[in-house]
């Protein structure tokens, strides 16, 4: 198990523009040839946007982009004609495929926090696609078949335990609270990268929320 602490993430964003970002993998100007991906996962970015802040229209291609809103509301508009407001507990997926442009903003009067994760598709190209799942339940894994991956959202009370899925590559990101994963204790913003995961259990040290990626061989 490879544990990465919250303070090891690369800082990003633009504080003057109301954007604070933390990147778990190489991203933008922060290049680390030894930290480009884990399994299909290319990025795990925690984004905090002040009211009125956001990312102007920008392009993506050949990427599966999955977003989970922690608090606040994320306004999304893209060149394929989708316009939605993504709220806390919602999962959003944008398949960039051969190419798409989008805007992401906090048009609400309260701060916005979301975790955005990028995955490499098994086959490049195709047509862009968009989906949103409102208030996804813990018992409902979210499949990203183009990347051979499955997202599990886990919300734990203190002392509660949950099985971590087995997989060739399993990535556990702690959104908030504290958990014990095997022999490791993880806090908010920490992550664990597990190769060949088998029989792992996560236990809430406090009330906690986790995002767990189950991925196959790449």
Identify the function of each model-found stretch.
Residues 61-80, 88-91, 166-182, 188:
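Glycine- and acidic-residue-biased ligand/ion/polar-headgroup-sensing regions
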Residues 44-45, 69, 95, 118, ...:
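Short beta-strand segments
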Residues 1-51, 55-56, 83-88, 101, ...:
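A short, N-terminal "cap"/entry segment at the start of jelly-roll beta-barrel domains
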Residues 80-95, 135-137, 161, 180-204:
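Short acidic-glycine-tyrosine-enriched beta hairpin
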Residues 141-168:
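Strongly charged, low-complexity linkers/loops
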Residues 53-60, 77-78, 103-106, 161-166, ...:
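Short histidine-centered beta-strand/loop micro-motifs
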Residues 81, 96-127, 195-218:
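Ligand-binding loop in jelly-roll beta-barrel domains
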